[in-house]
Amino acid sequence: MNFETIIGLEVHVELNTNSKIFSPSSAHFGEDPNANTNVIDWSFPGVLPVMNKGVIDAGIKAALALNMDIHKEMHFDRKNYFYPDNPKAYQISQFDEPIGYNGWIEIKLEDGSTKKIRIERAHLEEDAGKNTHGTDGYSYVDLNRQGVPLIEIVSEADMRSPEEAYAYLTALKEIIQYTGISDVKMEEGSMRVDANISLRPYGQEQFGTKTELKNLNSFSNVRKGLEFEVERQAKLLRSGGVIRQETRRYDEANKGTILMRVKEGAADYRYFPEPDLPLYEIDDAWIDEMRAQLPQFPAQRRAKYEEELGLSAYDASQLTATKVLSDFFETAVSLGGDAKQVSNWLQGEIAQFLNAEGKTIEEIALTPENLVEMIAIIADGTISSKMAKKVFVHLAKNGGSARAYVEKAGLVQISDPAVLVPIIHQVFADNEAAVADFKSGKRNADKAFTGFLMKATKGQANPQVAQQLLAQELQKLRD
């Protein structure tokens, strides 16, 4: 029997507000344990939550970016459960009226086609703390993360393969990153993914029993975990077994999934309205204000790059991978840079430099203005493409004018025949054996003179002009 794969994803995105959702503590990542906490985070008796308006702003932006409807009257709920990293014994979340609902995004499949994935809801909530189990037999609680604002984005079960799930996550990450509400760094926990997967016989309308996957710390592991579950569940069903509703974690070392617990349902959490927070009214003016702050998103930019700038689909995809890279490209083009040349530099030398340095483009000194000027002095013959690589490294580390640096460092390309011809004659005089080989008709003897000339000019001879003049002067030797 063959089965159809049904996948839905729950993505937790940590919002990059300065303070937490209900307390004034810093929400920044990487501090010493419990450094970013106060009495609200520790749930001291009598303390009350105070809503961070910036979190609602971010929620509205996310809902708009994901083509969602927005609840104009929004409230919070208590999700009750006990765990050491949750000192209140409940989490403030949203249950029946999330900030956003009925959304969708479009993903691009491996064959080049597109598919619309529906999004059921996006709700705001507070993050829990973190438990660390030490080798000394003790467990430690760090509440720095307690109260950090999250938006949970829940897709419909519209994905039919691990590859589609991977494409959905890639598209979702791009969109959220473009809004500026999160840096979506999985390695820092600001984007976390849970996957729900079930199988059903082809032709059956009813979904099968789903399994939830956790501990998916990379998009690659999401795909691997789902691929393993497809095989595990299919094998179990074909042998007459029954799929239980359970939570499993992906074990990267063993490339498989391991049972964590039997899955709870909503009733287990005993949701009820949060009594310490009011109803929040989101009017059209507020929504319009947030909409005005949104940028053009990756799909629209890719279409523009292909249709208006003549770039390939691959180039357009690479350039829109992050908003900062896309903004850099667009600024450079707006300053007169040739789109293809700018694209080549961003994907070539610049990308290699960034990878080697472990930096992003906003962390180096190169500006779009610097890059456009450098491309211009390559085009007008001031420097060669080879010399430009050296110039770029200087600009990346120090910034400044490309032309000014080239002139100060004595890197201006020599293109004047009146300067080059005497140097060529001196090369002939200094290399009599090579001249003799050339005159005797020795094969490829002329090739050596290019190297001699570049050495004599310290690499500053214009390669095209040098080759032309060498050919002329060598012909005179032959004659």
Swiss-Prot record:
Keyword check for ATP-binding: yes
Recorded GO MF terms: asparaginyl-tRNA synthase (glutamine-hydrolyzing) activity; ATP binding; glutaminyl-tRNA synthase (glutamine-hydrolyzing) activity
Gene Ontology terms: biological process: glutaminyl-tRNAGln biosynthesis via transamidation; translation
Catalytic function, reaction form: L-glutamyl-tRNA(Gln) + L-glutamine + ATP + H2O = L-glutaminyl-tRNA(Gln) + L-glutamate + ADP + phosphate + H(+); L-aspartyl-tRNA(Asn) + L-glutamine + ATP + H2O = L-asparaginyl-tRNA(Asn) + L-glutamate + ADP + phosphate + 2 H(+)
Keywords: ATP-binding, Ligase, Nucleotide-binding, Protein biosynthesis
SMART domains recorded: GatB_Yqey
E.C. designation(s): 6.3.5.-
Domain of life: Bacteria
Residues forming coiled coils: none
Protein's UniProt keywords contain Glycoprotein: no
InterPro entries: Asn/Gln-tRNA_amidoTrfase_suB/E, Asn/Gln-tRNA_Trfase_suB/E_cat, Asn/Gln_amidotransferase, Asn/Gln_tRNA_amidoTrase-B-like, GatB, GatB_C_1, GatB_Yqey_C_2, Gln-tRNA_amidoTrfase_suB_CS
PANTHER family tied to this protein: GLUTAMYL-TRNA GLN AMIDOTRANSFERASE SUBUNIT B MITOCHONDRIAL AND PROKARYOTIC PET112-RELATED, GLUTAMYL-TRNA(GLN) AMIDOTRANSFERASE SUBUNIT B, MITOCHONDRIAL
Described purpose of this protein according to its UniProt entry: Allows the formation of correctly charged Asn-tRNA(Asn) or Gln-tRNA(Gln) through the transamidation of misacylated Asp-tRNA(Asn) or Glu-tRNA(Gln) in organisms which lack either or both of asparaginyl-tRNA or glutaminyl-tRNA synthetases. The reaction takes place in the presence of glutamine and ATP through an activated phospho-Asp-tRNA(Asn) or phospho-Glu-tRNA(Gln).
Family label: Belongs to the GatB/GatE family. GatB subfamily.
Self-association and partners: Heterotrimer of A, B and C subunits.
Protein name: Aspartyl/glutamyl-tRNA(Asn/Gln) amidotransferase subunit B
Organism of provenance: Streptococcus pyogenes serotype M18 (strain MGAS8232)
Gene for this chain: gatB
